[in-house]
């Protein structure tokens, strides 16, 4: 799953895949702004078939946070 998440991040943010680690923070480490994070969440929802409510999306700060949420809520 990490590889697919990385692929989406590379596509959305234009960062090098080598920069993306599980502990990478979207804003601090990968340079995402608030619009980028919204677009990332929408891409993760579409790719993995999960719904991430705004209240949960606000808690997702790192790559590992996304993976944990998807694994816990995948249908």
From Swiss-Prot:
Residues 1-74 form the Carrier domain. GO terms for cellular component: cytosol; membrane. GO terms for molecular function: acyl binding; acyl carrier activity; phosphopantetheine binding. InterPro entries: ACP, ACP-like_sf, PKS_PP-bd, PP-bd_ACP, Ppantetheine_attach_site. It is found in: Cytoplasm. The modification O-(pantetheine 4'-phosphoryl)serine is found at residue 34. Keywords: Cytoplasm, Fatty acid biosynthesis, Fatty acid metabolism, Lipid biosynthesis, Lipid metabolism, Phosphopantetheine, Phosphoprotein. GO terms for biological process: lipid A biosynthetic process. It comes from the Bacteria. SMART domains: PKS_PP (SM00823). Pathway: Lipid metabolism; fatty acid biosynthesis. Gene3D superfamilies: ACP-like. Pfam families: PP-binding (PF00550). 4'-phosphopantetheine is transferred from CoA to a specific serine of apo-ACP by AcpS. This modification is essential for activity because fatty acids are bound in thioester linkage to the sulfhydryl of the prosthetic group. Belongs to the acyl carrier protein (ACP) family. PANTHER family: ACYL CARRIER PROTEIN, CARRIER DOMAIN-CONTAINING PROTEIN. Carrier of the growing fatty acid chain in fatty acid biosynthesis. This is Acyl carrier protein.
């Amino acid at each position: 799953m990490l590889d697919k998440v990385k692929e989406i991040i590379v596509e959305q943010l234009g960062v090098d895949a080598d920069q993306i680690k599980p502990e990478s923070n979207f804003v601090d480490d990968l340079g995402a702004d608030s619009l980028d994070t919204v677009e990332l969440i929408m891409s993760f929802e579409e790719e993995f078939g999960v719904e991430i409510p705004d209240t949960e999306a606000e808690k997702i700060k790192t790559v590992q946070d996304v993976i944990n949420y998807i694994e816990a809520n995948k249908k």
